[in-house]
From Swiss-Prot:
It comes from Solanum lycopersicum. The keyword Hydrolase applies. It holds the Pfam family Peptidase_C1. This is Low-temperature-induced cysteine proteinase. One of its GO terms (cellular component) is extracellular space.
Length: 346
């Protein structure tokens, strides 16, 4: 994970006095548990839940926010239904100046074209975000005592998948693959636990939540939950409610050739090429992207160097810092996104 927002705000200190337990559900700052369905958008649900809660804590208004806006519009580094990171979601909302409501931009359980009009409906904003000191459950406890916190954990293991209720103490590794939110902590019969808010629906586990053992021997926490904790920061009011305005002009899709096109804001990349002719086009979910030579992946314009073997993108040759390469999706026939288009291929 690339992060510029490391913070010692919640680093444990001598004399810290924390509540023995806290359950943010009882504080009225969490909306009902949502269901991401078959879309790999857990990162969006985690980030949104954290933003919903800090907005409620600061303003007193509990507003359900839009995961679909993140899935459709946050495409600089996140990949919609193919995964993402909560920190990048926070960055998107900060740069965008806010995020729309769930009611106005509802969840569709699939990737879609960014609705520019609703993207500009900035109902709730955050000021920044910070990362909790990693591999430190005491620091995480201190953070959760102040607000719900986004985390990632390994959820693909057999024990985790078959867990039904009670405090989870099963076997799992630290290959974190699922974004959730820690919504509190407590102790039962001498065992410390975290209250974890999932995004698999309210009928899953304990009404959509689960309890995971806390203060284990591993510094990374059970299932790696202390590896990537972060939280949004909000200090000011939300933007004023904008006056109704007509939808922004919709940009035409990108034409790859006379038969194929990609959605607006994406780049045409050839998948099947013979000599200088392309027989099948794909779409990289970024504007101005670099098409990698493997005819499968692509890189953001600010990380233009393709490292095909590693599946990463670098800012320059030999630079060890990079981001994960993105996958292309198949282009659509001309007319699939409506009339119009422009040539823009790489």
């Amino acid at each position: 994970k690339l992060s510029k927002n490391k913070s010692d705000r919640y680093l444990p200190k001598v004399g810290d006095s924390l509540p023995e337990s806290i359950d943010w559900r009882e504080k009225g700052v969490l909306v009902g548990v949502k269901d991401q369905g078959s879309c790999g958008s857990c990162w969006a649900f985690s980030a949104v839940a954290a933003m919903e809660s800090i907005n409620a804590i600061v303003t007193g208004n509990l507003i359900s926010l839009s995961e679909q806006e993140l899935v459709d519009c946050d495409r600089s580094y996140n990949e919609g239904c193919d995964g993402g990171l909560m920190d990048y979601a926070f960055e998107f909302v900060i740069k965008n100046g806010g995020i729309d409501t769930e009611e106005d931009y509802p969840y569709k359980e699939r990737n879609g074209v960014c609705d520019q009009y609703r993207k500009n409906a900035k109902v709730v904003k955050i000021d920044s975000y910070e990362d909790v000191p990693v591999n430190n459950e005491k620091a995480l406890q201190k953070a959760v005592a102040h607000q719900p916190v986004s985390i990632a954990l390994e959820a693909g293991g057999r024990d985790f998948q078959h867990y039904k209720s009670g405090i989870f103490t099963g076997k799992c590794g630290t290959a974190v693959d699922h974004g959730v939110v820690i919504a509190g902590y407590g102790t039962e019969n001498g065992m410390d636990y975290w209250i974890v808010r999932n995004s698999w629906g309210a009928n899953c586990r304990e009404n959509g939540y689960l309890r995971v053992q806390r203060n284990v021997s591993s510094s990374s926490g059970l299932c790696g939950l202390a590896i990537e904790p972060s939280y949004p920061v909000k200090t000011g009011p939300n933007p004023p409610k904008p006056a109704p305005s007509p939808p922004s002009p919709v940009k035409p899709p990108t034409e790859c050739d006379e038969y194929s096109q990609c959605a607006v804001g994406t780049t045409c990349c050839c998948i099947l090429q013979f000599r200088r002719s392309c027989f099948s086009w794909g779409c990289c979910p970024l504007e101005g992207a670099t098409c990698c030579e493997d005819h499968y992946s692509c890189c953001p314009h600010d990380y233009p160097i393709c490292n095909v073997r590693q599946g990463t993108c670098s800012m320059s040759k030999g630079n060890p810092l990079g981001v994960k390469a993105m996958k292309r999706i198949l282009a659509q026939p001309i007319g699939a996104f409506g009339n119009g288009g422009k040539k823009s291929s790489s």
